[in-house]
Amino acid sequence: MAARVLAPPGPDSFKPFTPESLANIERRIAESKLKKPPKADGSHREDDEDSKPKPNSDLEAGKSLPFIYGDIPQGLVAVPLEDFDPYYLTQKTFVVLNRGKTLFRFSATPALYILSPFNLIRRIAIKILIHSVFSMIIMCTILTNCVFMTFSNPPEWSKNVEYTFTGIYTFESLVKIIARGFCIDGFTFLRDPWNWLDFSVIMMAYVTEFVDLGNVSALRTFRVLRALKTISVIPGLKTIVGALIQSVKKLSDVMILTVFCLSVFALIGLQLFMGNLRNKCVVWPINFNESYLENGTRGFDWEEYINNKTNFYMVPGMLEPLLCGNSSDAGQCPEGFQCMKAGRNPNYGYTSFDTFSWAFLALFRLMTQDYWENLYQLTLRAAGKTYMIFFVLVIFVGSFYLVNLILAVVAMAYEEQNQATLEEAEQKEAEFKAMLEQLKKQQEEAQAAAMATSAGTVSEDAIEEEGEDGVGSPRSSSELSKLSSKSAKERRNRRKKRKQKELSEGEEKGDPEKVFKSESEDGMRRKAFRLPDNRIGRKFSIMNQSLLSIPGSPFLSRHNSKSSIFSFRGPGRFRDPGSENEFADDEHSTVEESEGRRDSLFIPIRARERRSSYSGYSGYSQCSRSSRIFPSLRRSVKRNSTVDCNGVVSLIGPGSHIGRLLPEATTEVEIKKKGPGSLLVSMEQLASYGRKDRINSIMSVVTNTLVEELEESQRKCPPCWYKFANTFLIWECHPYWIKLKEIVNLIVMDPFVDLAITICIVLNTLFMAMEHHPMTPQFEHVLAVGNLVFTGIFTAEMFLKLIAMDPYYYFQEGWNIFDGFIVSLSLMELGLADVEGLSVLRSFRLLRVFKLAKSWPTLNMLIKIIGNSVGALGNLTLVLAIIVFIFAVVGMQLFGKSYKECVCKISQECKLPRWHMNDFFHSFLIVFRVLCGEWIETMWDCMEVAGQAMCLIVFMMVMVIGNLVVLNLFLALLLSSFSADNLAATDDDGEMNNLQISVIRIKKGVAWAKVKVHAFMQAHFKQREADEVKPLDELYEKKANCIANHTGVDIHRNGDFQKNGNGTTSGIGSSVEKYIIDEDHMSFINNPNLTVRVPIAVGESDFENLNTEDVSSESDPEGSKDKLDDTSSSEGSTIDIKPEVEEVPVEQPEEYLDPDACFTEGCVQRFKCCQVNIEEGLGKSWWILRKTCFLIVEHNWFETFIIFMILLSSGALAFEDIYIEQRKTIRTILEYADKVFTYIFILEMLLKWTAYGFVKFFTNAWCWLDFLIVAVSLVSLIANALGYSELGAIKSLRTLRALRPLRALSRFEGMRVVVNALVGAIPSIMNVLLVCLIFWLIFSIMGVNLFAGKYHYCFNETSEIRFEIDEVNNKTDCEKLMEGNNTEIRWKNVKINFDNVGAGYLALLQVATFKGWMDIMYAAVDSRKPDEQPDYEGNIYMYIYFVIFIIFGSFFTLNLFIGVIIDNFNQQKKKFGGQDIFMTEEQKKYYNAMKKLGSKKPQKPIPRPLNKIQGIVFDFVTQQAFDIVIMMLICLNMVTMMVETDTQSKQMENILYWINLVFVIFFTCECVLKMFALRHYYFTIGWNIFDFVVVILSIVGMFLADIIEKYFVSPTLFRVIRLARIGRILRLIKGAKGIRTLLFALMMSLPALFNIGLLLFLVMFIFSIFGMSNFAYVKHEAGIDDMFNFETFGNSMICLFQITTSAGWDGLLLPILNRPPDCSLDKEHPGSGFKGDCGNPSVGIFFFVSYIIISFLIVVNMYIAIILENFSVATEESADPLSEDDFETFYEIWEKFDPDATQFIEYCKLADFADALEHPLRVPKPNTIELIAMDLPMVSGDRIHCLDILFAFTKRVLGDSGELDILRQQMEERFVASNPSKVSYEPITTTLRRKQEEVSAVVLQRAYRGHLARRGFICRKITSNKLENGGTHREKKESTPSTASLPSYDSVTKPDKEKQQRAEEGRRERAKRQKEVRESKC
């Protein structure tokens, strides 16, 4: 890196590329070749790869030249230069820079072998190529070409235009080829894949022109690919496309899994429903007329009869005949019809399960949930309601799981991309630092030299002047720095002028503070501020602050954004889109907020000075209101107009020229809060980010010239503009005027004015929301006047602010610009009110609603998230737009003609339907609809007119690319911009907005008034002094009680306060109000004698060292001991942790079985009778009774009994359907049961009251729920007894009994967990819901403006036909017809309309969920004017309104729910997760590895049989190859099943039968062989039992197929189940790791998903009972018919399951909205006393909307949250070095070495075992040394325990870690628990010690031998005898110390005593847990 970084940047780097340069390169190439002769062997190739230099990422072609290189010297733009990148020193390349400093790299070899780099033609080509105008022209050409492509019938002359385009593209390619060369060397034309695209497009153009290829239109569609050229022209798009391609690669595993799962489900569907969807009701018996007999010669044609449509039963108003089934729960036929297989399948024959391919399509449709309610209803009608189970499985496993896996994968890919970007940025920062250090050194040297020259203390000016004169003096530092990009003279002159001006102005004003002369040459004044209490003597310079706002400096964002400060991107907004920032979401983007880019970094001096002239504190003009840093500022600062309308000028906030340099400003209340001593220095804040070191070094390094440069680059406007601004936009003409300004400023900036304006906004919104149709003229008049008034108010506000702030500063603030825009529009609208067609301007008034965002953080956050996403998504949106465009054009070119020619196939009137591709707009709409997820219906039309293959391909591509990939990437970006930090930032930003301030002021006022009244009362009614104190005491009691219970705020009584004369309290009393701004709405302001400690989250306070001592010292003379509570938990979250009191259970071991007090202390004090003596008399009996009740209630059986009762009572509710009247017995039983249940529940409640006492009972939310439900039952019981059961109110109370099942919630742990999590999320869900409502309000009001009253139409009810415009034009025409005695004609409204805002909301909900939206859109598109008959597509561009709403209203807001829920769960996990947070990543990995290996134990392998033949079979069966062969057979069997179709011939059927027989024989053989080899052990393995059952069923199925099919399901289904065995094969395939991860994620999510499923079932249960009691008798129409209705419990559940995914809820709602005359109030229902079939619109809307919000938005999104969470965990685990499978294989191999499962292995086998393992645990031979080094403990008999080996091997893979021991201990406990072993083995030695013993024995032997040899004894026998004895002796001696020292070694084999201790501890722990569980129960 050193070489690369220290390449000297600056003007010297720019060297023109000359023939000498080329010669140098060639010389270097030759040298390098000589240096490194190529290696003969390829052995170390890889290492070389790593060590090779890599190209510098900042100097890549296409990127901007890094800032550090300065400006390009004159004359070197567009001239070939030598390459900057050292990497290319030995390659023939050169670079060229254009004016925008973009870098282009070319090959220095001759282009096309002719044109050298110095050739004139090539140089001209290069100049053209790199010029920005050239790319602009190409861009414009492409866009124009795109416009021409959208013509459906191009005019004649367009042919010539076509040639022009081709010519331009050819010219472009030629220029590129001449400039770059064609294809041989690097950087030539064809080396860039995007150029391949260009090349192919041009070739196609010429081929189609000169060669006749038949179908031209298909080839013309390839021209569309030209649109893709935009991607190659706009640099940022390439990155996004790269990311898309990455995510598609990552999706491969998910795709495989998806296809596999869908295939399995499709096979099941094929077997279950083959041919069912052709069942129709045919006229029966046949009417044998003459028509069927031709002169008696020909018989009856059965085929023709059943395929004749006229013989089918058609439901009125439906296009398809009615389906039916022959099972009891399927759809039935009416009288006179018989159910039989006839005709084709529904939907042109494309919806069926007749062949595998159609079944697969149906399943894909189910997975994407498009119009699946139709498939669901058809299938249940044809096959029976029981098959709902199939759909539940597919929707939950297929749809929710797989689709969200796609989302998870895309999100992960995005996250990885983001990480890479961040790392790159950090690396750049390091490089930048190194460069700056170098510059600094140069500069310091220069300055030292300068100092030496200029004797002593000459000012900087003098030095500069000397430099200017150039008399032997060194150059000024700015020149030395090599950054000097402009003539230094210019800059120096400017500096001088500025300095003089500053000095003169400073003198004039006589600044009280000393103005320091500029220490830096940037002309900025640095002021030294000393903090009041002199705790810090640091000079605070503006330079330090200005640094804070360098784009990308680490302090710019509030989060720890890792931004780069390397590639400074010249003038703010025009940054290079291809930069590393492309993918960054808002947090990590290089320049935090987009506003941040808009401002110049430094303030024009003059503006600053002027500004301060009336600020009253001119010296401090820079830091107006900066109380945070300078708390002792005078109050007068408040008037300074730098304050924006919010009263806040923040460093990073809404950017303003001034704001960028100011420290954060605060409000008056905060100034008061922070006492004079509080030390709030922003350096402290910087340190808190853990970046101090980096910051300091950068601060010291950024050179003055660099800052100067920045200043230049940040000023976007020419100097004349600033002059103009100073003269005309800053009004300071007269002292009186300034006085007036101050007064206006005081008024306008007051928080109360803000409050008033906010109230006006809310009122104005209300006024706009009150518009409806039809309105009375008076009401209309009121609204018009209201509008004028509000316009007036807002205009006045704007003008006053303009006066107060000056236009220049007014428009620096984003909100003000917004206000100004809206006010101008409103005024314009007033002027143009009467102009026709401009009523749309009224819609702009709606934008006022957004002004609420200023004071409503969540709305602000939502807008920010949308803003950030749109920002970060800018490129993605462009890519999406290009995709939509391309597909729309392709669709139009390919299918447009077909739609016109074959229109009669899809339309009865032979008119083009609404959805077609005949022109571009409609084609675009179809593609957009596919992106919304609705593809199947338009695809059927397409397939019918244009053939199946092409349509399937195009639609699937749009669906997969557009919907599944790009839209999920959108969602991933949304979720990422939703990170917790955003929420935290909005929750409490430390800053209070004016609204909060005004509310606090009002509260203070009220509190003050209370105190005054209190004092007044006391003065009048003179009482004793004791009484005087008492109310305060009581107040304290109450407050303390309430606060301690609920708010988690510690309160300390301050005992010695004194009263002063007016009854307020001195000392703490008066002052505490200043400091406490309590979230709990100031609950203690009224009580001035409390010191309150409010916890502030550490991570949240903007300045960490907030010294609270000051607060207490000021408030309390003795100095109270209150410090800030560090352990607070409100870390920016949306849920509050419970007060700590609850977390520490008070230990009461001996008396925890005693009941709690009955009443609260307050009650006992007031009513003495509540207090009884429990020692004697009645009190004692009462106490015994309570204890008995307590024992009963706490008993497990009691709880079980109650759960049983709850389930029974809930079940009883399910019987109360419409048939209950006819079933007298059941009805009577239910009535009695109801009473019994009520009595039991009342008894239970009384018992609990007695046992727990009222306090405990009524402080538990679950008990409240029980209480309310029991109360409802009791009321209805009493009402029945008194005979009031028919009263409406009592009836509706009875429906509330549906809530009974809710009681089950608290009883089932799983559901309770989910509900608790949900309850935690409710506040933020409600918040988002509210924001969504506000957001939708705008669209709703707009809808009312556009469509109110326009949805009515004239309609003939008998023929069900709408009148055309020429027959009936408007309402009056229709009424005339009605008067003409035509009873069947009506003027009717669409049920879902925009007549008022409420109705608009419902319509928008349908559009957002894409259900029923078509009818709403059609009505809008046909609308004309209020009360006019609609005209078909007369208002076609109204589609755009819906498109915009879908993007913003549906897309962003609905996905926001997912964001909020995921975010919330993560936060709750953080708070309550415990162990996860306190572990490092390493520990987690260890812990997971250990967790996995602890639960396993070595199993005894199945012993090999002794019989020889059995043994051979055993070996054969247990081989892996055998398993794989069987798997392949299973797959083949599946393939043969796929071949089956409904219409197959007899011959085919026979072939399939025999093939199947062969497979059955194979599987039977497998089964028999295994049973023979494995003997009785065969049945100890689950999979074998499964196989056995399947084989038996298959054999039985072969013989009894007919009988089984008649009574049960088709036997082939069992074969499908066999597919489950494929799961086993996955372990054997190494490549399937990704799929294993996905399945593992599913397994991990199952428990949580089961809990959510339970909760969902409970919700469905309650709603279906509610639906039965309210909508049972609704008229059958739309989505409600004889099968799908609310008449019985089963039917209700079927309907509600369908709505869980929001499918078809519009159809179910429509009949419920019926009112007479659409329904009858007197209709009789046989067998029931109920009359009428009308619905109840309000109840219906509430029912469906609440159900959709609960199920579709919340519960289903919880499902998504869990899948995303577990997927990331599973991915992490699969990335771990050790996975589950590795441990599995470890144990499998272990079994071979330890056949008896003793858990020990002999030392001698260890080396073989280690070698037999698989990677990564394997220790390959030779491994003796390594195994010895592991120091494994051994027990007697030289055996080693398996867990010790596993630990050692794991440690070897994962590396050592200090925390291993603790984890290890836990693992051992687990292992010992799961493998209770009778014998305890104590280790006596270890492998290392054993080796040491062996080695020492050998050494001793050698020594002794030598000793003997020296002594001369050579008699062998004696020697050997002695040696043997000595050896064993010594060995024994050696071993004693080893055993003694061993117990310290921590292994699994532990002494018994320790185990007993552990067991004892475990028992204690269990007892404690049981106690806690008892207490948690109600």
Swiss-Prot record:
Extracellular compartment ranges equal: 152-158, 212-217, 274-355, 381-387, 771-781, 836-837, 891-919, 941-953, 1216-1228, 1281-1288, 1345-1397, 1420-1436, 1540-1550, 1600-1612, 1667-1688, 1712-1740
Name of the encoding gene? Scn8a
- Return the protein name: Sodium channel protein type 8 subunit alpha
Q: Where are the I-type repeats located?
A: 114-442
Record the organism.
Answer: Mus musculus (Mouse)
Q: Where is the composition biased (Low complexity)?
A: 473-486
**According to the UniProt record, what happens if one changes residue 1904 to A?**
Decreases interaction with CALM1 in the presence and absence of calcium and reduces rate of channel inactivation
Lineage of producing organism: Eukaryota, Metazoa, Chordata, Craniata, Vertebrata
Q: Which residues are glycosylated?
A: 215, 289, 295, 308, 326, 1356, 1370, 1381
Q: Known catalysed reaction(s)?
A: Na(+)(in) = Na(+)(out)
Found, by tissue, as follows: Expressed in the hippocampus (at protein level). Expressed in brain, cerebellum and spinal cord.
What stretches of residues are II repeats? Answer: 733-1005
> Where in the chain are disulfide-linked cysteines found?
281-333, 904-910, 942-951, 1354-1374, 1719-1734
IV repeat extents: 1502-1799
Task: Give its localization.
Answer: Cell membrane; Cell projection, Axon
Q: How is it modified after translation?
A: May be ubiquitinated by NEDD4L; which would promote its endocytosis.
